[in-house]
Design a protein with these regions (language model features):
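Short alpha-helical elements
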Residues: 1-260
């Protein structure tokens, strides 16, 4: 017997947030709690929609709601509601990870484009780690996600950095990154924004100050990725479209914010 993903206490937290962001012109499922449990079960287990246990309701109800809300930006809005305005922006960490795509993730409609353009549109590409996507995150001083970018797997992390920071309510005091972000131009851009860069230099670069006490906390963003990848549909991309995959990431990040 599959129990609801949401205990009474958990649902008392989730329900008002969902009611805030769900489309008001649409009638919610008769049992929204059960449908949400089905969506969560599918993404936590990386299963096919048809594999959703019957106790959680018709699989097509869950699939239709997930896809419709993904296209409307509801899951992104839910993530924004969950993170609130009390994020710890003294330290902000930037980090990216490659997510390998399941072979069925490459089946999105071409819409008149070539296969290459289709893959670029859906944030899919081939890197040394295989065929997949690059997901970058900005995390706060508590190790909680603040913003995401999604690009093809072969993309470098640095071009996504400013988009991650632009999504924050104000400039953080310190921006902590690994050597993949080492660039004098990027450091200068951070200073111009009022943020101090905490980025180790590469071996072929002149030494630049990098406060060790701040860099020592970079494990917080690594731990965030470890938690998010406990969702099998985050650790492996099963979604054909970038919109749906970003929705999965937002659901996992929302759950991480609301975890007690």
């Amino acid at each position: 017997m599959i129990q609801s993903v949401f205990s009474d206490d958990a649902w008392s937290i989730w329900e008002p947030l969902i009611e805030t962001v769900r489309p008001k012109g649409k009638t919610p499922p008769r049992d929204l709690r059960r449908t949400m449990s089905a969506i969560f079960w599918r993404h936590q287990n990386g299963a096919k929609w048809r594999s959703i246990p019957a106790e959680l309701g018709p699989w097509w109800t869950a699939a239709q709601l997930f896809i419709r809300w993904a296209k409307l930006g509801v899951w992104q809005a839910l993530f924004e509601q969950a993170k609130g305005q009390d994020s710890a922006l003294g330290l902000v960490f930037l980090d990216g990870t490659n997510i390998r795509a399941h072979h069925k993730a490459a089946g999105a409609a071409k819409k008149g484009d070539s296969g290459e353009r289709r893959n670029d549109r859906e944030a899919l590409g081939r890197s040394r780690g295989g065929f997949g996507s690059k997901v970058c995150v900005a995390a706060d001083g508590h190790g909680k996600a603040l913003s995401f970018t999604l690009t093809p797997g072969q993309a470098h992390e640095l071009p996504s950095a400013m988009a991650l920071l632009d999504a924050l309510p104000h400039a953080p005091r310190y921006v902590v990154c690994d050597r993949g972000y080492a660039s004098n131009q990027f450091r200068e851009a951070l200073w111009d924004r009022g943020s101090r860069p905490v980025i180790p230099t590469k071996r072929n670069e002149p030494q630049v100050a990098c406060p060790k006490w701040a860099y020592r906390h970079r494990h917080l963003v690594e731990n965030l990725w470890a938690r998010l990848k406990e969702w099998r549909a985050v650790a492996t991309r099963y979604e054909k479209t970038a919109t749906s995959f970003m929705a999965v990431i937002c659901i996992a990040a929302t759950a991480d914010h609301l975890k007690t």
